[in-house]
Design a protein with these regions (language model features):
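Amphipathic repeat-derived elements
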Residues: 32-37, 138-139, 150
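Left-handed beta-helix
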Residues: 76-127, 131-145, 155-157
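Residues in well-ordered beta-strands of folded domains
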Residues: 71, 120, 188
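Short, charged low-complexity intrinsically disordered segments located at boundaries
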Residues: 42-47, 64, 97-103, 117-121, ...
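Terminal amphipathic alpha-helical/low-complexity segments used for targeting or macromolecular assembly
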Residues: 1-93, 201-211
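N-terminal alpha-helical segment
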Residues: 66, 110-111, 151
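Glycine-rich hexapeptide-repeat left-handed beta-helix
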Residues: 139, 146-211
Length: 211
């Protein structure tokens, strides 16, 4: 059986098992499915840890990324909010990730461990890394701008009216709320409750991506 068809059947079986509808068995648009599959394959092709490998649906980070892309293109190309919502909910149930189909993610990004990651409708740069428990959130209608090569380590947060410059490394537990960060720096929690910035020159995302 063609790998794409087999994967479609796999996703359909999961949707019908965990989030069935009264309309019967799920049908997925082949074109949107293949666009989503191409998007995740393209994204992981730049990840050093995955270099030389094909998309692996048993890799939770890869599969979470795929389900996001699939839900996004089912919503955008097919205008099928019901199926897109079911795929979003499946992703949330399987991986503990909150990545809504209306969020516009970049071509290249990496989900480390997916559990507890929350993405709002922010602006995301390329080649960003998101680890478990991190949050990109809004404050009323204020949403962050995340620059290229940003790395968010576990349990860090960027919330509200923030502009995070390129090549910003946000260390574990750091909360950036309604504040701009210039970029080319590592952000640490300060002893006085403020943030401490350490300048860097190297692009740290090169440890994760072939760039």
């Amino acid at each position: 059986m063609n790998k794409s068809i087999a994967l479609q059947n796999y996703v359909i079986h999961q949707l019908d098992t965990f989030f069935p509808t009264v309309e019967g068995k799920t049908k997925l648009n082949v074109k949107s499915f293949n666009i989503g599959l191409h998007a995740v394959s393209n994204s992981i092709s730049k990840v050093l840890a995955y270099r030389g490998t094909e998309f692996d649906y048993l890799n939770s980070g890869q599969y979470a990324t795929f389900l996001y892309y699939l839900s996004h293109y089912v919503w955008m190309n097919d205008s099928d909010k019901v199926t897109a919502t079911r795929i979003f909910l499946l992703n949330k149930a399987l991986h503990g990730i909150d990545l809504f189909y209306e969020v516009k993610m970049p071509k290249y990004f990496l989900v480390g461990h997916s559990s507890g990651i929350v993405f709002t409708k922010a602006r995301y740069g390329e080649y960003c890394v998101f680890h478990q428990g991190c949050t990109v959130g809004r404050n009323f209608e204020d949403r962050p701008i995340i620059g290229n090569f940003t790395i968010m380590y576990p349990n860090s947060s960027v919330i509200g009216k923030c502009k995070i410059g390129d090549n910003t490394i946000i260390t574990p537990g750091v909360q950036i709320i309604n504040r701009n960060i210039p970029g080319n720096c590592i952000v640490f929690p300060g002893s006085d409750g403020d943030l401490k910035l350490k300048k860097i020159e190297k692009i740290m995302a090169k440890k994760y991506f072939d760039i």
